Amino acid sequence: MFIKNLPHKTVERLSQYRRALLLILSKEKTHVFSHEIAQMLHITPVQVRRDLMLIGYSGNLRKGYDIKELIDLIGKIIDSERGQRVAVVGLGNLGKAFISYFKGKRSKLSMIAAFDVNPEKINRVFDGVPCYHINQLPEIIKQNNISIGIITVPSEQAPEIAEALVLSGIKGILNYTPKPLNVPAYVYLEEYDMITSLEKVAFFAKKNDERFK
C-alpha cells in the first residue's frame, strides 16, 4: 500500500506509533485513544489524529482506535511487501549495536551483511550476520539484493563508502557519521549527527537548569 506525498515526519511518527501500539497490545488492551498514544510519545493528540487521517484511518468515538487493525495498516504503508534487506558498513560498537537490535525482530527489515577491514572481524558471524571485507561490498550487495546501507565508519571514510553503496545499487542510506554526504536524487539519505544531537540536548538541559533554579 503506497500513499503518495506522505510527509517524512509523518512516516517517522507512524513507525513510533507502531512501536507504542505494540507495547499497549502487550498489556492485553484492544483499543486506544489518541491522547494515550500522544502521552507516550510526548506529542499532541491533534498531531496523532492528523497523521492517522493522512493514512485514511479514524477511530471510534467511544472506543478509540482498534490497536491490531491500526498496527496492520501502518505495516502495509511503511513496510515493503517483500521485505527489505540491510547491510551495515563498519563493525565497531555502533555497528554491532545495530546487528544486535535487528536480532529476533519481527520487522520487514532484515540485517543480511556487515562489512569491515579488521582481519579479526572478517569471515566471522555476529548474531547471525556474516562480516565481509569491504572490498566484497559490491558483490555481496548485488548477490543478496540489499537495498539499505547503514554507515558507521570513521567520518573521513564515509563519502567513499556512500559512493560504493550507490554504485552497488543501494536505494537508501542511513549515515551515522558527522560527515555530510552527497548522493543521487534516486537514493534516499537520512543523516544522524550524534554530536549535534548531544550538543542540542546539552544546550536545552543547561537552559532548563537555569530556568528552574
Task: Please report, for each region that a protein language model flagged, where it lies by residue.
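Extreme N-terminal segment that seeds HTH/winged-HTH DNA-binding domains in transcriptional regulators
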Residues: 1-30
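Phosphate-bearing ligand-interacting subdomains
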Residues: 17, 22-25, 129-213
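HTH-adjacent hinge/linker in prokaryotic transcriptional regulators
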Residues: 31, 35, 40-85
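Glycine-rich Rossmann-fold phosphate-binding loop(s) that bind the pyrophosphate
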Residues: 91-92
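N-terminal Rossmann-fold NAD(P) dinucleotide-binding loop
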Residues: 95
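NAD(P)-binding Rossmann-fold cofactor-contacting core
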Residues: 106-127
